Design a protein with these regions (language model features):
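Alpha-helical membrane segments and immediately flanking helix-loop junctions
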Residues: 123-150, 154-157, 172-214
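Helical membrane-embedded segments and adjacent short helical loop/helix-boundary regions
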Residues: 2-16, 20-82, 87-94, 98, ...
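Short alpha-helical transmembrane interface motifs in multi-pass membrane proteins
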Residues: 7-8, 59, 93-95, 121-122, ...
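Small-residue-rich segments of transmembrane alpha-helices in multi-pass membrane proteins
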Residues: 39-51, 71-76, 97-110, 128-138, ...
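Juxtamembrane boundary at the C-terminal end of a transmembrane helix
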Residues: 221-231
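Entry/N-cap segments of selected transmembrane alpha helices
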Residues: 11-16, 87-110, 152-161, 211-216
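Transmembrane alpha-helices that form the ion-translocation and gating core
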Residues: 97-135, 158-173
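Helix-loop-helix hairpins and the membrane-proximal interhelical loops
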Residues: 80-92, 115-116, 139-157, 228-229
């Protein structure tokens, strides 16, 4: 089967799209947030590769066009931000302070976990960019000596958890301001959280999209500094 797929060119793209479509179908059929389309799609791809004995490296190479689309997809999130530009100008200081606090909290939590669990450095640095989009996080992890695949898995898991629990946490903490909710989701759960923020409202989506970009830049700059404090 692996040899047959190698002759099919971009079979990985088709497999990825089919798995995601199946994940969307399962999510709509069940109506449960737990059955997140991205989570279900990932499971379907893993099962497919395992059943047919296809190496992950072959799948990754074949699905490369999907990875290339990550960056323009992330950039496109600036569109709702442009539509809410006046809101950004009015709350500029508070917005950037909030994102900075989120980034420092994310890095600090990884440092604490690394010290408590005595994680290997290669694993710990792969966790540092867990709250930024994969387009940035995987490169940051590799630059610091981590594993891109592990970083990607942790980033996706972080996004799924943030998407599932973000709105509930806001309700429990009585956070009602749409700007605050959007910044929280974008800073902690990157693009996956932003998809949830867009469902919550225009302001939430715009602020979450901004948080992805700013948090990504801050993490890329601060992660090497944080890595110096790893055990």
């Amino acid at each position: 089967m692996a040899e047959f797929l190698q002759q099919c060119g971009s079979w990985g793209v088709l497999a990825t799209l089919a798995a995601y479509a199946a994940g969307v179908w399962v999510n709509r059929k069940t109506g449960k947030a737990l059955f997140n389309p991205l989570l279900m799609g990932s499971i379907f791809v893993i099962v497919f590769l395992s059943c047919f004995g296809v190496p992950y490296a072959d799948y990754k190479a074949s699905a490369q066009p999907v990875s290339w689309l990550l960056m323009p997809a992330t950039v496109s999130l600036a569109i709702p931000l442009y539509e809410k530009w006046e809101l950004l100008e009015k709350n500029l200081a508070a917005i950037f302070a909030s994102i900075a606090a989120g980034v420092l909290t994310s890095l600090g939590s990884v440092l604490a976990m690394a010290w408590v669990l005595r994680l290997e450095r290669a694993h710990a640095v792969s966790f540092l960019p867990k709250s930024v989009t994969t387009a940035i996080g995987m490169d940051v992890a590799e630059t610091l000596g981590g594993t891109a695949a592990l970083a990607g898995a942790v980033i996706i898991l972080t996004g799924i958890v943030g998407s599932l629990l973000g709105e509930t946490v806001c309700k429990v903490c009585r956070i009602t301001d749409p700007l605050a909710k959007g910044l929280a989701l974008g800073t902690s759960a990157h693009a996956i959280g932003t998809s949830k923020a867009l469902q919550m409202g225009e302001i939430e989506g715009a602020m979450s999209g901004l948080a992805i970009a700013v948090a990504g830049i801050m993490t890329a700059l601060l992660a090497p500094v944080a890595a110096n404090f790893l055990p």
